[in-house]
Amino acid sequence: MSVVEIEDGVFESTATIDNGSFGTRTIRFEAGRLAQQAAGAVVAYLDDETMLLSATTASKSPKEHFDFFPLTIDVEERMYAAGRIPGSFFRREGRPSTDAILTCRLIDRPLRPSFVSGLRNEIQVVVTVLSLDPKDLYDVLAINAASASTQISGLPFSGPVGGVRVALIDGQWVAFPTVEQLERAVFDMVVAGRKVGDDHKDVAIMMVEAEATENVIELVAGGAGAPTETVVAEGLEAAKPFIAVLCDAQAALAGAAGKETAEYPLFPDYGDDVYYSVASVATEALSEALTIAGKNERNDRTDEIKVEVLNRLAEQYAGREKEIGAAYRSLTKKLVRQRILTDHFRIDGRGVTDIRALSAEVAVVPRAHGSALFERGETQIMGVTTLDMVKMAQQIDSLGPETSKRYMHHYNFPPYSTGETGRVGSPKRREIGHGALAERALVPVLPSVEEFPYAIRQVSEALGSNGSTSMGSVCASTLSLLNAGVPLKAPVAGIAMGLVSDDIEIDGKTERRFVTLTDILGAEDAFGDMDFKCAGTKDFVTALQLDTKLDGIPSQVLAGALAQAKDARITILEVMAEAIDTPDEMSPYAPRITTIKVPVDKIGEVIGPKGKMINSITEETGASISIEDDGTVFVGASNGEAAQAAIDKINAIANPQLPKVGERFLGTVVKTTDFGAFVSLLPGRDGLVHISKLGRGKRINKVEDVAKVGDKLRVEIADIDNRGKISLVLVAEESETAADAPADAPVDAATTSS
C-alpha cells in the first residue's frame, strides 16, 4: 500500500474496495493538512463527496484516581455537510442525534480494547462530518477515520482498526453499499477488526452490528436467500479482506505521518504481590460462594468475603486498597472461567447450553394499547405498546437518509433494576444503543403502513437485570405488539450468548478450549471473552451484535455459537407462543385509524382556506385527520362511527356525486349577503337562494329577516350554470303542502341525498 506526499508534510494513502459487478469504492486517508495541533488528525474521504475529519487528543497528565480508562468518542454532525441549515430554533446544531450517538458506540467498541491496559490519560476522539453525499452512510467511514487519527497520534494503541459495512445483495456481499443498494439487500452488517498474527495476514473480528433489512421478507418471498446463521457466518468471512485493505492503508499512512509512540504512565489494576495474597486468603471461600444460584444471595456472600479480605490485608497493603479490590475481582473472574472450562458448569449451576426459567404474560397494564411481561431468570422486562396516527411518527433532523420513523423503540434502564441507586432522567448512550438494537430486531417483521396505518411507540422497561435486558426487550416487545393487535409477519425472540476460552492442559498437552454459553448472566458477560446477542424468527436472523476481547474467533466456534443461539431462540419462541401466538383484538382505548385516497388536485379543497374545511370536519366529528402529499388521508377516532362520519365528509368533497337539478336538501345557512343566502348542501358544495326567492312570494327588504347563519332550510336545486354555480329555491314545509301533495309525490331528497 503506497503513500503519496501530495504537498510538503501532507500525506495521503488510498484503499480501493472492489465489489466486482457492483463497482469500486475508494477510501482516502489524508494527514498533515487539518487540525495540526491535535495529537493525531486524519481526513477520510469516501469517493469524492463524503469527507470526515477525525482528531485524537490526550490529556497531559493521567487521572490516577480513575479505576477505568477515560476514553471519550464524539461525533459532530454538521448540517452544512448536506447543504442544510439546522431546523432548531437557534438554527445551529445542538445535542447529538441518535445516529451520531450510535456511531460513537460503533467507534468506541473496537477502539477501547485496542489501547494498552492501565492507561489513565484522558483520550478524546472527535469525528466531524464535513461533507456527506446523500447516497452514502458515514458511520463506517467514521470508524476508519477514528482509528487512523489514533494510529498516528503517538498513543499506545495496537491498531489500526478497519471497519466495513457489507450487505447481501443479489447473493453477493457488497462493501460500502449505497443507500439505494441497501434497499435491495436482505442483510446488512457493520464489521470491525484488525490484522493479527506474526505475518499480519489474519484478520481478527472485534465488533459486529448486523440486521436484516426492512424488506427482507418480501425479498425472500421473491427468491432471495434468507439470512440464516450460515449466511451470516459467510458474511463475516467476506468482510475480512475488505478490513485488511483498510488496515493496510491506515498502517501505510502511519508509517509516513505517524508519531513515535510516547511513554505514558500505566497504572495496572493490581500488583502480583497483592493478587497472590488475595488468592491465598479468599480462593476457598470464594469458590464456594460462586456456586450459589441466586444473584442477590451470591452477591451478598461475595461482598462479605471481599470485606473480610480487605480487613485482613489492609494493614499489609496500606494505601493499596483499590488494588485489593481489583485483585479480588480478577480472582473471581479466574474462578468463574475455570469452572466453566473444566467442569462445564456455571456459577448458577446451569450447564453451558441451559436457559434460565422463562415466563411470558400479556395484558399486564390496564389502559395500555398493548403490554407484556417477559422474564428470564432474574431479568425482567415489561413491554408497553402505544398506537397513534401516522402523523405522530418521529421527525428526524440528522444527516442520515431517514427523515421520519414510524416505529419508535425506547429502552429504559432504571438503577433499581440492579438494586442500586443512581441518576434517572434523559436516556444515556447505553439506553439509546439497547433501544436501537431491539428496534432493528423487530423492524423486519413489522407490517407496512398500508397494512397497518399506525405510528407505533414501543417502550421496554428493564425492571430487573441479570444478563441481556436488550434481548429480553425483543421478546417482551413481540408479546406486547401482538397484544396491541399489530399483525407482525413473524414473532421474534432474542438470546445473549457468551464465550470463555483458555489454554487447558490435558494429559500433559496444552490445547486451546472454547466453551460457548447460552443465556449469559451479567457476571458471565463481564468475565467472558465474547458478548454475542442474536435475535430472529424461527427461520432467520433479524439482528446480531458481537463484541469480543480475543484476537480472533475460529470460524467453526462462531458457527457453533450461531447454531446454539438458534436452538435457544426456538425454545423461547415456543414459550412466548403459549402466552400469545396471534394478534389480539385492538384495545378499546386505541384509536381506530382508516385510510382513504383522494385525488391530489382535491387536497386543497379538503383542507380549505387556512385549514377551515379540515378543521370543521375535525370539530364536527371528533376525528383526527392527516393528509399526505400523495393524497393518502389518515382518519383516526376513538370509535368507528366518528371515523366514518369524517370519511363521508371528506369523500363528499374529494370524490363527490355532483348534485342534479331538482334534488332537494335540508341545508344550513353559512353566509348571508344583500342579495341572498348561501346554503351548504354538502361539504364544500354551497348554493344561493336569491333574496327574491326567500319571501315565499312576498317581498322582503333584508335577508336576515327570514334567514340567519346556522338556520336550516329545505331547498331544491333550480339551476346549475356552466360554471357549476347552484341556484336554489325554498321548498314548502310538509305541513304547508301535505293537504295538496299528490299521492305519487317524490320522496324528499333530504332523506336520500348526501
Curated annotation (Swiss-Prot):
Belongs to the polyribonucleotide nucleotidyltransferase family. CDD domains: KH-I_PNPase, RNase_PH_PNPase_2, S1_PNPase. Residues 591-650 form the KH domain. It is found in: Cytoplasm. SUPFAM superfamilies: Eukaryotic type KH-domain (KH-domain type I), Nucleic acid-binding proteins, Polynucleotide phosphorylase/guanosine pentaphosphate synthase (PNPase/GPSI), domain 3, Ribonuclease PH domain 2-like, Ribosomal protein S5 domain 2-like. It comes from the Bacteria. GO terms for cellular component: cytosol. Its cofactor is Mg(2+). Its main location: cytoplasm. It catalyses: RNA(n+1) + phosphate = RNA(n) + a ribonucleoside 5'-diphosphate. The gene is pnp. It comes from Mycolicibacterium vanbaalenii (strain DSM 7251 / JCM 13017 / BCRC 16820 / KCTC 9966 / NRRL B-24157 / PYR-1) (Mycobacterium vanbaalenii). The keyword DNA damage does not apply. InterPro entries: ExoRNase_PH_dom1, ExoRNase_PH_dom2, ExoRNase_PH_dom2_sf, GPSI/PNP, KH_dom, KH_dom_type_1, KH_dom_type_1_sf, NA-bd_OB-fold. GO terms for molecular function: 3'-5'-RNA exonuclease activity; magnesium ion binding; polyribonucleotide nucleotidyltransferase activity; RNA binding. Involved in mRNA degradation. Catalyzes the phosphorolysis of single-stranded polyribonucleotides processively in the 3'- to 5'-direction. Keywords: Cytoplasm, Magnesium, Metal-binding, Nucleotidyltransferase, RNA-binding, Transferase. Mg(2+) binds at residues 525, 531. Its EC number is 2.7.7.8. Residues 662-731 form the S1 motif domain. This is Polyribonucleotide nucleotidyltransferase. The keyword Iron-sulfur does not apply. GO terms for biological process: mRNA catabolic process; RNA processing.
